[in-house]
From Swiss-Prot:
It comes from Sus scrofa. This is Prolyl endopeptidase. The active site is at S554 (charge relay system), D641 (charge relay system), H680 (charge relay system). Keywords: Acetylation, Cytoplasm, Hydrolase, Protease, Serine protease. The N-terminus is blocked.
């Protein structure tokens, strides 16, 4: 590889902060101001090296052409019924945003109901959340611009898809819950703040409040229904009970799967909703999660992890709510995790479990909890479901590494509850029968068995010669289940690659126990698990260190950056997308304070001791051995990422280039690409997705000398 001339970047050696008696230098703290001329010049100088490097990758054009060709397949959501109509999302293939369609019946003609593509020239305005009124006659929907988490809520009359004048601003991380009379909707908003709020700012998000908006009135008249002046981090989302009588308020403080649960009986609000509601504090601690399923009168069914890390269903009678009186409806499974539950046809429950990172779907009886039926499913994930208490049918969508999607429909009024294939999608150009998926369990450093999926062409020789792409996340109780990815399958098909997904601790793959095994003082387990995944792939002959790429985004960006610092010898290439890199300061920006439940917070001496040991920004060092250099690294971020603000990646790349990049033995590139009019990832237009994956895989091909296989 060629050596790189990186930009000269100012280091402020006087920027020193004292953490519990430890002096920590932060020479690139000036990059924390996104609007300064200096930061803008830094971004421009970095993109000036990276963009040509990516464009000169011989494979980039071939990859982009193939991606554009193969990604051009129809993408459907499940149909869902609202009032008397059916709705579904559909993308013909390469549309920037999927379109919402309406039908009067399943056989009826489909009409466009809402097309976000006409709201911008470049597809950067995206639908972010929506809610229909109970009778299906009114529709509220959130729009976000350029990938920001900030949302503007608008309203439509469903009949004739007529736009209404109501507009709600300063909305973020919001519920959308209509009262059943259709007169208005609960939502969340933040107070006005100094400076801008367009997704390029870094100011912290505190004091979220719950409001009720009456349709046809101005936002300034909205009714404040809940606020927590003494608890600035609390966020309270509202939901209406199935019978419309109760408002349930779920209060969260961070990202842990725990919440308080307050409720208000709307029949007690004799004058309607006029101010702060009369909240009854059913659960007033953060010792478990309570997820509302349905209720029969005052008996409420919740999915909970209270004394059940794999989750169970309990009934709580609001007239006698003592914990000793709670009844177990469906007990916790000893191994499988209960992921979600829905009530349908008034007396059925649909339960979705995760069994060794593969979904299973079951039908239970609401009155007794008894198992009635197991729906047949291949090995893979349930990625879509629709069916509410008043519906008599369900739709669910299945996907896997090699199947783009099958939607099933089941009519629950029939004697034989047999689901039928409602819609199946195929991708022309990739023959699934040429490839295989295996799941293995490898030992981590402490002996814990970690699951990993491996996808590759059938019949390959395990001689260590193949490029491999290892993906991981490992945080926030999020399970990484099989999903269909054209971009990764192109790597397998045209770059002779092996795809691996490691289900490391910190995720929710085996419930709250698995999550807790990879957070706070145990965070190093995530990095050990991931490094052991790499070692397994190498030992078994799938790949070799110089042919191995690791990739992750957000918390997964933290993962791969930390692994590069800890084991630079183990990987050939690292692609870190929108990563959390400064573990001492992350809690100071936008919604970062919510992640202290997983990471801890440097304000605490004990937490500081954990964080300083692995924080990517603070652990960059030149490898001592002469024959070891850092892997090729590409950091990706964007100007409107207000979830993980870009300063994380900017400060990290400056540090890498200074400490490692100036060394004569460092021939592998250390680069960053900062996109514009893009954010953390949600709602990213197809055109940008194609550019991004073309950059990623072109970088891998160029750095690891991979040839294109026609």
């Amino acid at each position: 590889m060629l050596s790189f001339q990186y930009p000269d970047v100012y280091r402020d050696e006087t920027a020193i902060q004292d953490y519990h008696g430890h002096k920590v230098c932060d020479p690139y703290a000036w990059l924390e101001d996104p609007d300064s001329e200096q930061t803008k010049a830094f971004v421009e100088a970095q993109n000036k090296i990276t963009v040509p490097f990516l464009e000169q990758c011989p494979i980039r054009g071939l990859y982009k052409e193939r991606m554009t060709e193969l990604y051009d397949y129809p993408k459907y959501s499940c149909h869902f019924k609202k009032g008397k109509r059916y709705f579904y999302f559909y993308n013909t293939g390469l549309q920037n945003q999927r379109v919402l369609y309406v039908q009067d019946s399943l056989e009826g003609e489909a009409r466009v109901f809402l097309d976000p593509n006409i709201l911008s020239d470049d597809g950067t305005v995206a639908l972010r959340g929506y809610a229909f009124s109970e009778d299906g006659e009114y529709f509220a929907y959130g729009l976000s611009a350029s990938g920001s988490d900030w949302v503007t809520i608008k309203f439509m009359k469903v009949d004739g898809a007529k736009e209404l004048p109501d507009v709600l601003e300063r909305v973020k991380f919001s519920c959308m819950a209509w009262t059943h009379d259709g007169k208005g909707m609960f939502y969340n908003a933040y107070p006005q703040q100094d400076g801008k709020s367009d997704g390029t700012e870094t100011s912290t998000n505190l004091h979220q409040k719950l409001y009720y908006h009456v349709l046809g009135t101005d936002q300034s008249e909205d009714i404040l229904c809940a606020e927590f002046p003494d608890e600035p981090k609390w966020m309270g989302g509202a939901e209406l009970s199935d019978d419309g009588r109760y408002v349930l308020l779920s209060i969260r403080e961070g990202c842990d799967p725990v919440n308080r649960l307050w409720y208000c009986d709307l029949q007690q609000e004799s004058n309607g909703i006029t101010g702060i509601l009369k909240w009854v504090k059913l659960i007033d601690n953060f010792e478990g999660e309570y997820d509302y399923v349905t209720n029969e009168g005052t008996v409420f069914t919740f999915k909970t992890n209270r004394h059940s890390p794999n989750y169970r269903l309990i009934n709580i009678d609001f007239t006698d709510p003592e914990e000793s009186k709670w009844k177990v409806l469906v007990p916790e499974h000893e191994k499988d995790v209960l992921e979600w539950v829905a009530c349908v046809r008034s007396n059925f429950l649909v339960l979705c479990y995760l069994h060794d990172v593969k979904n299973t779907l079951q039908l239970h009886d609401l009155a007794t909890g008894a198992l009635l039926k197991i729906f047949p499913l291949e090995v893979g994930s349930v990625v879509g479901y629709s069916g509410q208490k008043k519906d008599t049918e369900i739709f669910y969508q299945f996907t896997s590494f090699l199947s783009p999607g099958i939607i099933y429909h089941c009519d629950l009024t029939k004697e034989e509850l047999e689901p039928r294939v409602f819609r199946e999608v195929t991708v022309k150009g990739i023959d699934a029968s040429d490839y295989q998926t295996v799941q293995i369990f490898y030992p981590s450093k402490d002996g814990t068995k970690i699951p990993m999926f491996i996808v590759h062409k059938k019949g390959i020789k395990l001689d260590g010669s193949h490029p491999a792409f290892l993906y991981g996340y490992g945080g926030f109780n999020i399970s990484i289940t099989p999903n269909y990815s054209v971009s990764r399958l192109i790597f397998v098909r045209h770059m002779g690659g092996v795809l691996a997904v490691a289900n490391i601790r910190g995720g929710g793959e085996y419930g709250e126990t698995w999550h807790k095994g990879g957070i706070l003082a145990n965070k190093q387990n995530c990095f050990d698990d991931f490094q052991c995944a790499a070692e397994y792939l190498i030992k078994e002959g799938y790949t070799s260190p110089k042919r191995l790429t690791i990739n992750g985004g957000s918390n997964g960006g933290l993962l791969v950056a930390t692994c590069a610092n800890q084991r630079p010898d183990l990987f050939g290439c690292v692609i870190a997308q929108v990563g959390v890199m400064d573990m001492l300061k992350f809690h100071k920006y936008t919604i970062g304070h919510a992640w202290t439940t997983d990471y801890g917070c440097s304000d605490s001496k004990q937490h500081f001791e954990w964080l300083i040991k692995y924080s990517p920004l603070h652990n960059v060092k030149l490898p001592e051995a002469d024959d070891i250099q850092y892997p090729s690294m590409l950091l990706l971020t964007a100007d409107h990422d207000d979830r993980v603000v870009p300063l994380h990646s900017l400060k990290f790349i400056a540090t890498l280039q200074y400490i490692v990049g100036r060394s004569r033995k460092q021939n592998n590139p250390l680069l960053i690409h900062v996109d514009t009019k893009a954010g953390h990832g949600a709602g990213k237009p197809t055109a940008k997705v194609i550019e991004e994956v073309s950059d990623m895989f072109a970088f891998i091909a160029r750095c690891l000398n991979i040839d294109w296989i026609p």
